Design a protein with these regions (language model features):
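Acidic catalytic loop of the alpha/beta-hydrolase fold
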Residues: 140-144, 170-171
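Short beta-strand/loop motif that positions the catalytic acidic residue
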Residues: 129, 134-137, 141
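Catalytic histidine-centered segment of alpha/beta-hydrolase-like enzymes
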Residues: 168-180
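Alpha/beta-hydrolase fold active-site loops
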Residues: 8-11, 132, 160
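Catalytic histidine neighborhood in serine/cysteine hydrolases
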Residues: 155-171
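Primarily recognizes the serine-hydrolase "nucleophile elbow" in alpha/beta-hydrolase
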Residues: 66-131
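Short alpha-helix in the alpha/beta-hydrolase fold that links the catalytic acid
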Residues: 145-153
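Serine-hydrolase catalytic machinery in alpha/beta-hydrolase-like enzymes
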Residues: 1-79
Length: 191
């Protein structure tokens, strides 16, 4: 919790795919959490159902979207949260689960997708999204060709921002600081 009385912007961070080792303790999630907490954000990171000590089991995005809805409701009730300054930050499958919910929920003002898995989920809803959005991909990401990422981003309506970090792959080892810098600057500018 930031010091002071607020209200403070808030971000809900959604982790990568549960079936491939994704959890709220992922390197990207932890780096974002550490950096944004120093920027006076109220933050929530959580494990999707069936991960860590969470109840339930993976349900191919359906239950995970319910988890995101619950996280938004929980965060919106935390004292000190600026209700018009909330964002969803999703990494990989976390973007696939979190961004559609954030798009539909009027409490969410901004969306961030890190390594959005276009082959796993349909991100076409973003073509109708007028909320500020940031998309980041690694130039060496084996799951998302840079050409496809750029083609998709070019078709999105404003406001938008997108970046390819040339030497980074899908897992961002050693590039966490670059991600956190881009995400922090974006959220500070739109929230």
């Amino acid at each position: 919790m930031p010091e002071g009385s607020g209200p403070f912007p808030a971000a809900i961070i959604c982790h990568p795919h549960p079936l491939f080792g994704g959890s709220m303790d992922n390197n990207v999630v932890n780096s974002l959490f550490a950096t944004l907490s120093q920027e006076s954000f109220i933050l929530l990171k959580f494990n999707f159902r069936g991960v860590g000590g969470s109840e339930g089991e993976f349900s191919h995005g359906i239950g995970e979207q319910e988890d995101v809805r619950a996280a938004i409701s929980f965060t919106s009730e935390v004292a000190g949260v600026a209700l018009k300054k909330m964002a969803i930050v999703g990494y990989s499958a976390g973007a696939a689960f979190g961004l559609p919910v954030g798009f539909e929920d009027n409490r969410i003002k901004a969306l961030v997708a890190i390594s959005p898995p276009f082959d796993m989920s349909d991100f076409e809803f973003l073509r109708n999204c007028l909320k500020p959005k940031l998309l980041i991909s690694g130039g060496e990401d084996d799951f998302i060709p840079s050409s496809r990422f750029l083609e998709f981003c070019h078709m999105l309506p404003e406001p938008k921002e997108y970046h390819i970090i040339e030497a980074a792959d899908h897992f961002w080892g050693g590039y966490e600081d670059i991600i956190t810098t881009k995400v922090t600057a974006f959220l500070n500018s739109v929230l």
